[in-house]
Each structure stands twice: as C-alpha cells, then as structure tokens.
Amino acid sequence: MHYLTVQDVLWIHLQIAKKPGKFSFANLEEATSYQYAYGKSHDVMSQAARFFGGFATKAPFDSANRTVAFVAGVVFLELNGRHFNPKEKDLGAWLDRAVNQPTSNEAIEESTIASTDSHPVECRDVAKAVLEKYEAAIKKLLE
C-alpha cells in the first residue's frame, strides 16, 4: 500500500488554493490518517472511502477541504492500483456520494478500474496528473 504524507496533502492544498492556508495540524494529521486501516492494509476501496469521508469531515484547512479530499482521495486510489474513471460528469455530486459513508464504497467502486500500470510512481507526479486532468472539476468544486 502507498500512502500520502501530511506534507503531500499540504502540497496538494497549496496547488489548489494557490497560497498557503491556515490549518489545524492536529486535524490535518487525523484527516490524513483516515487512509490507514487497522491490522493488515489490503482493502483499497474501504480505505479510500474512509479517506474521502474522514478528510472532508475533519476539514483541517480554512478553505478547499472538499477539493483537497477529492484530489488526495483520487491520488490514493491511483497510487494503489485503482484508476479513477468516473462515469458521472458532475464530480461534485460524485464527491457527495463518496464522502457519505452509506454510499462511499459504491461510488468509488463504480468509478475505478484496476490499473494496468505496474511501475512505481511518485505521489507528487500522480497528484500533478490528477490536478491537470480534473482542472475544470476542481475549479467548480472551489465555487
């Protein structure tokens, strides 16, 4: 399993907000830790669901928390062999489903496919690709 660090999430927030923002370090650490599972970590979908929902709920930043949750969650999926391929055009509506515990696993499973890439990837490279690919959706999430 590959995980984002607190520093990775701070970097993602900086790319989205375009300026350093205020944040609660304790909440940021807790929000970032939602990607982990107890015991053996092998269930990417459940861990991603916890990460999307937990990060959005913890809201460690003074702005753009849902958007950071979206980007960081997609990066987590991509790092762990799940290619994000949403069928929904409205990623805001998709994110609402992904952060809502009863529907989160379903939303994530419907929107990902197993990746055929087997080479190691760097978190920031994946994040840059996600930020570029979903630039329009990210702008819309920030509105």
Identify the function of each model-found stretch.
Residues 1-143:
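FIC/Doc superfamily catalytic core
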